[in-house]
Amino acid sequence: MNDQKIIVALDYDNQADALAFVDRIDPASCRLKVGKEMFTLFGPEFVRELHKRGFSVFLDLKFHDIPNTCSKAVRAAAEMGVWMVNVHASGGERMMTASREILEPYGKDRPLLIGVTVLTSMEQSDLAGIGLDLEPQQQVMRLASLTKNSGLDGVVCSAQEASLLKGALGQEFKLVTPGIRPVGADVGDQKRIMTPSKAIESGSDYLVIGRPITQAIDPAAVLAEINGTLA
């Protein structure tokens, strides 16, 4: 399987609609992201349905808890066979290290473990509101460095931070980028956005795209078009 760069965010409150969409696209063209709403509604069985169809799944639950609890949740994700799982880097080094260590018995079959830095909806005023008197980019760099030092595989970050992070943390450190909108797409609720080709040029490894694909009349064609710009 090619290392698909597009991760389609499945944001549905209806499992039948989600699977109807999934059945219109090819597992060779993308991976799928299951977030808090869908997982809370439909649970591990929904992930199994996606696996049955041949898709790799990014379980986007952003675990953030004491090290023992967080690491056990990460292990549960590994047992489910997901391709990627994430934790909040602001949970600290001990939490992230425990989560990494619990995956070691899975060897090459373990999921990628990714840290969440600063949510792409957050601006400087939002950080100030939680007592952080710095620019989003500064906090991203601080948390990304902590994530790497904890031995994780990469971080979720906005495309604007990608080149800076690649330069500081190395080419092997994976960057997963939400806030991606193909040319002409609606900006939605993401504050820091970029087109797919620009994001890859900037250093992003994986691109999270939702509504521009899930709400398209012909999602397979949109995927083909975006993948074409990344070739």
Swiss-Prot record:
GO biological process, one term: 'de novo' UMP biosynthetic process
Known pathway: Pyrimidine metabolism; UMP biosynthesis via de novo pathway; UMP from orotate: step 2/2
Pfam families: OMPdecase
Domain of life: Bacteria
GO CC terms in record: cytosol
Record bears the keyword Transmembrane helix: no
GO molecular function: orotidine-5'-phosphate decarboxylase activity
Top-tier EC class: lyase
Lyase is among the record's keywords: yes
Record's catalysed reaction(s): orotidine 5'-phosphate + H(+) = UMP + CO2
EC number(s) from the headed UniProt entry: 4.1.1.23
Keywords: Decarboxylase, Lyase, Pyrimidine biosynthesis
Protein residues bound to substrate: 11, 33, 60-69, 120, 181, 190, 210-211
Family: Belongs to the OMP decarboxylase family. Type 1 subfamily.
HAMAP family: OMPdecase_type1_B
Main function: Catalyzes the decarboxylation of orotidine 5'-monophosphate (OMP) to uridine 5'-monophosphate (UMP).
Assembly behavior: Homodimer.
Protein name: Orotidine 5'-phosphate decarboxylase
Species whose genome carries this gene: Vibrio atlanticus (strain LGP32) (Vibrio splendidus (strain Mel32))
Taxonomic lineage of the native organism: Bacteria, Pseudomonadati, Pseudomonadota, Gammaproteobacteria, Vibrionales
